[in-house]
Amino acid sequence: MTKSIPASYFVSIVPGVISAGGSALDLNGLMLTNGTRTPIGSVLSFASAAAVATYYGASSTEATAAAVYFAGFDNSNVKPGALLVAQYNTANVAAYLRGASVSSLTLAQLQALTGTLIITTDGTQKTSGTITLSGATSFSNAATIIQAAFTTPNFTVSYDSVSGAFVFTSNTTGASSTITYCTGTLADALNLRLADGAVTSQGAVTAVPGTFMTAITGITQDWASFFTSFDPDNGSGNTLKLAFANWNNTQGNRYAYIAWDTDASPTTTVPATTSLGYLLSQSSVSGTSLIYAPA
């Protein structure tokens, strides 16, 4: 059996933004991540690996993948122009409100803030008592104080050091988990309004490959290949990877699915009848390329 294609080789076949002629389809890559930082139902675009690291964190899986992606192949003279990222939730997820960054505030400035917040979570409006942050010892402690100002909150409040923002997360998951932006006299100072740059992500049930990918094409089709930053089947079988491949097979060879596979059985057994490559070959699925990565 021939050797598997390394991940670095994959990047060489997605060299970046090269006009396909006519009106502007770019050969961008689309990364599906199972992290919740990307809001549900959105596709984010990043122009550099540094931008990905800033958004997701320097040690994140997304940043690691982006560093390889944007580097291109050895001696390449054309680099990728953008990396698109969407959240593929592998389980039911909760709604959240993530404010814009407040990291420019000093602790003393944070301690000077006082006021109220109003937020609707899971259809129930909650109004805080007066929030006084004079006793806050840190931004994380301020989040605890904010949550405590609500009577029986149906959400938790935390401080996210990566984005430098306060995050309100519903206590429920799934489609009924919903959240709004904050109002109230303290909402502006804490950057919890849409006008301040805050974002919301509504709850969702576990994603299904075909339905999910069709929804993505309804948001944008400005990409040529897609891959996951994780094994969709979590190292057990190929059900979801096959579902992605089967969806892609119906797209008229418009996209390439770069499937990450951790199954080492083809290196020891020929034919490896349960392996993804064997199953794809037997079904004559088009448009899928496999990358072996040890688990």
Give a label for each model feature:
Residues 11, 82-83, 155-159, 174-202:
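Generic structural motif
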Residues 1-111, 158:
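Extended assembly-interface regions of large multimeric machines
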